[in-house]
């Protein structure tokens, strides 16, 4: 039986209760078979084009890098149906679930974007849907909670632990342990136990594939760097995957520095964590001095995650990708700058990547560079959060 690699260097693996191993084995085999099935690929591509709206645009910014020699393009995943990159891989996994004969879907969500994407895919494909969401995130993201419920999903608030994404992940896995015969766990990021990191990357890699074709058509060359925010890491690995072999292209992932790395209120385990076992995988993890999982923090719910996908850990370890961090305040500035200068309201998550690109442009204004930011989602879900933050700062 063909098998996928369970590890990226030392990272990854499958650290789950024995009861889930058959479900993960079944998923791996179904994915391998589906990837070799032309009819499955055609159905997936048809959904991406006719339902989700691919290909998404590659937009050259007009004003935000004025006074520099940087050309900054945005890969517009914010224009995808559902409002973020999440829709890509959710459609793939939902098709896979149907192929396996599962008729219920379990999901976890932080910002609510994965929950919304899962709910829309389930509505489209006739699957039952239940979404676990940290109670704090239910408060932070009420528009997305209502969207999920409108599309027929059951949203289950999780009050344990920090009542955020990591706790929702734990509850979703617990549910799946008891229901895997009829339910598929539709994991929302390129992390977790094998084979999820590989499956999610493959269903997201269309981001980088399109970007490569579009930038070559527009500029006649590859970009100097592609930049993406990193929480669990699915939008970033989707952007990076097709560029990993292109050694001239820098891969830059941006973790949330939150209120500052020195404050411990951040979500940057790649650069500031220790390797541990969490969420079914071996990966960098925010831990306290006793080795317990430390609470992560970010203004953006979708980056508020104490670990990171194993392929990012590997790309960091071998030096192929660079990982930097951006604070809440810097992300907030970039959020406003894009709205004011380009008429585009980005997700707070994506604003972290944008902030770093703007920094790169103005750090060397005379340097001719071609940058692409993965604008992973739109900011409608964040306008109330941003309004309150600006009000509190007296900046309105």
From Swiss-Prot:
<feature type="modified residue" description="N6-(pyridoxal phosphate)lysine">
    <location>
        <position position="86"/>
    </location>
</feature>
<dbReference type="InterPro" id="IPR023026">
    <property type="entry name" value="Trp_synth_beta/beta-like"/>
</dbReference>
<dbReference type="Pfam" id="PF00291">
    <property type="entry name" value="PALP"/>
</dbReference>
<dbReference type="InterPro" id="IPR006653">
    <property type="entry name" value="Trp_synth_b_CS"/>
</dbReference>
<comment type="pathway">
    <text>Amino-acid biosynthesis; L-tryptophan biosynthesis; L-tryptophan from chorismate: step 5/5.</text>
</comment>
<keyword id="KW-0057">Aromatic amino acid biosynthesis</keyword>
<protein>
    <recommendedName>
        <fullName>Tryptophan synthase beta chain</fullName>
        <ecNumber>4.2.1.20</ecNumber>
    </recommendedName>
</protein>
<dbReference type="GO" id="GO:0005737">
    <property type="term" value="C:cytoplasm"/>
</dbReference>
<comment type="subunit">
    <text>Tetramer of two alpha and two beta chains.</text>
</comment>
<dbReference type="InterPro" id="IPR001926">
    <property type="entry name" value="TrpB-like_PALP"/>
</dbReference>
<keyword id="KW-0028">Amino-acid biosynthesis</keyword>
<dbReference type="GO" id="GO:0004834">
    <property type="term" value="F:tryptophan synthase activity"/>
</dbReference>
<keyword id="KW-0663">Pyridoxal phosphate</keyword>
<keyword id="KW-0822">Tryptophan biosynthesis</keyword>
<dbReference type="GO" id="GO:0000162">
    <property type="term" value="P:L-tryptophan biosynthetic process"/>
</dbReference>
<dbReference type="InterPro" id="IPR036052">
    <property type="entry name" value="TrpB-like_PALP_sf"/>
</dbReference>
<comment type="function">
    <text>The beta subunit is responsible for the synthesis of L-tryptophan from indole and L-serine.</text>
</comment>
<dbReference type="InterPro" id="IPR006654">
    <property type="entry name" value="Trp_synth_beta"/>
</dbReference>
<comment type="similarity">
    <text>Belongs to the TrpB family.</text>
</comment>
<keyword id="KW-0456">Lyase</keyword>
